[in-house]
Amino acid sequence: WTTDRDGHTVKKYTPDGELLLTLGTFGEWGCDASHFNGPTAVVVQLDGNIVVADGYWNSRLVWFTPEGEYIKSVGEWGRGQAQFNTPHALTQDSKGRLLVADLCGGNFHDYMTVPGQIETHRTKPDKDCVHRIQRLDASGAYIDEWTHIMPLSLASYGNEIYASDKMSNLAILDEETGQVKSRVENIAIYI
């Protein structure tokens, strides 16, 4: 799976590089069943459904069937439960719950956009925003959130969540509590 932020697509390939599925419309941004606006991550759920973090401009998660048929979207820009600023990374834990790395504002730049693509207020840091990992059930319903880390990327292995932050650190979290089990400093940002 690949996400193409600026091409507004998510693609599934075989290990040999054969394209199997394209979600979104290349080069066309939007916020509907067939368009993304800066997708950032993708997860295949335990039931085979596909969840895309449409993160940079639309601030939503989008569900598709294994064949690529649109199911629904969850979220909008905001700081509430199952609302997002920038859903930048996405993973699922061993129980199928979704974890969303939600970055605060200031991640957008005027040169990255075309007129009408993004609201002007979204290009500035939000001083009241809290970086967080939101935990949702498999359908996208809010469970809780962890705010003690500034997440940039996420991965799940066993009963642990690996979260890299914007300070080039890696935190290994307990998937049930979100508590930091260990930390590795000055490591690559993306995992």
Language-model segments: what does each one mean?
Residues W1-I191:
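Eukaryotic scaffold repeat domains enriched in small/polar residues
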